[in-house]
A protein has these predicted regions:
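Cyclic nucleotide-binding regulatory module and flanking cytosolic helices
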Residues: 1-30, 87
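Residues that scaffold the ATP/ADP-binding catalytic core of kinase and kinase-like folds
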Residues: 61, 84-85, 116-117, 158, ...
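Phosphate-/nucleic-acid-contacting segments
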Residues: 149-192
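Short, Lys/Arg-enriched anionic-surface-contact patches
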Residues: 83, 141-154
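Glycine- and acidic-residue-biased ligand/ion/polar-headgroup-sensing regions
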Residues: 48-63, 79
Length: 192
């Protein structure tokens, strides 16, 4: 599997992994390529897989009283692990939907196989706690930006950190993620 090496690099940065763990993990991974926009998880479902983004973009959609289609509450990029927050690790019904954009390549691990890895390998639980911590820290930083930054600064910063999102995602998805009205994001993008 050509993308397994990328997964191992990311895992090893989170926690040193043993050769035995690597051998146990490899046959459990399934590669998925997204051809069209794909809803991977619906609100109320229990997520049965965790995904690793090899390339492409995945978004989280939260219910919103002000829009029928919901709002983009999170993006996952290449090198990220995709899981419903909260809910996945507790096995609870998801409060969000997860959607992958066309061209996204994912590696998938079932919830059951993940549980066995956590149970049988010391690094399994360390990896999970590190993933949860990093996810929560990134979400907290984003919430802080939404509260503390002006829209123009937030768009500028996000554009420079994640240009690929602007080539892949719909403007309305980016706008809702940044807390901006759909039609307002274009004026902030001028001059970038």
């Amino acid at each position: 599997m050509e993308y397994f090496g990328k997964l191992l690099q990311v895992l090893d940065r989170l926690c040193p992994i043993s050769g035995v763990f690597e051998k146990a993990l490899k046959p459990l991974i399934i590669q998925k390529e997204v051809g069209t926009v794909k809803n991977m998880l619906r609100e109320g479902e229990v997520q049965q897989q965790i995904w690793f983004v090899v390339s492409g973009l995945v978004r989280e959609i939260s219910s919103s009283a002000d829009t029928v289609s919901g709002r983009t509450s999170w993006f996952w990029y290449a090198g990220d692990f995709v899981f419903a927050h909260p809910g996945f690790f507790a096995g609870l019904p998801s409060l969000v939907e997860i959607e992958a954009y066309p061209g996204t390549v994912l590696l998938e691990l079932s919830r059951l196989d993940l549980a066995l890895l956590i149970q049988n390998f010391q690094e399994g639980s360390v990896l999970i706690e590190t993933l949860r911590y990093r996810n929560q820290a990134a979400r907290s930083a984003h919430t802080s930006d939404l509260v503390n930054l002006k829209h123009a600064e937030m768009v500028r910063r996000y554009y420079h950190e994640h240009k690929v999102v602007f080539l892949t995602a719909r403007a309305k998805d980016i706008a809702s993620f940044l807390g901006i009205k759909d039609n307002g994001i274009h004026r902030f993008l001028r001059g970038l």
